[in-house]
Design a protein with these regions (language model features):
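Terminal amphipathic alpha-helical/low-complexity segments used for targeting or macromolecular assembly
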Residues: 1-109
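Structural signal for interior beta-strand "rungs" in well-ordered beta-sheet cores
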Residues: 105-184
Length: 184
């Protein structure tokens, strides 16, 4: 908490500062546009800070036995706090079912194929996700490649459907054109 919380608050403050500087460019008679721009810039700046944190401090997640060290726990906790933040959600949720959301997940380390209908999904270890071409996601999907003992990749083959409220655990392969039912 002595490292993670100040880092999270500092990144929120930096994103807000960047957004405020962008709003200063508008005249006062364009206030409605300025408010919209503020929120957009704030969320996108926080998202970019999250990507930088992932690449520079947290690093990649690899399949195998979890080390169980304090550093490992801290990096998972930090990324979880950043990806559950309202500013991160504001930078990802508006792009549901678009190629832009796939690109944003790729920047975090996920391997996502072409023409993937990605809804917002919950995950921390993006490096352990391998999603094929033409995959369809439902809403509220949880991809959890990690447990207390080990990290295992999750593979979703071409043309598969992962429907609403599904939870996929580490080591799972959803085969080509398979469909997971709702709440599985």
């Amino acid at each position: 908490y002595f490292i993670g919380v100040p880092l999270l608050v500092s990144c929120e403050a930096l994103a807000t500062y960047v957004a405020l500087r962008a709003v200063e460019l508008f005249a006062s008679d364009r206030l409605l546009i300025a408010v919209w721009l503020f929120r957009l810039v704030q969320c996108e700046a926080f998202y970019l800070l999250t990507v930088a944190l992932k690449r520079l401090i947290i690093g990649k997640f690899a399949a195998g036995k979890r080390p169980g060290t304090l550093r490992d726990v801290l990096r998972r906790w930090l990324l979880d706090r950043f990806t559950r933040n309202a500013l991160f959600l504001g930078a990802t949720e508006p792009y549901v079912n678009t190629e832009l959301l796939s690109r944003k997940y790729r920047l975090l380390g996920a391997r996502i194929g072409k023409r993937v209908n990605v809804d917002f999904f919950d995950s921390v270890e993006y490096d352990l996700l391998d999603i094929g071409d033409e995959v369809v996601f439902g809403s509220c999907v949880v991809l959890a490649p990690s447990d207390d003992a080990e990290d295992l990749p999750i593979r979703i083959d071409d043309g598969a459907n992962v429907l609403d409220h599904s939870v996929l655990l580490g080591g799972v392969t959803v085969e080509r054109r398979a469909v997971t039912g709702t709440c599985t």
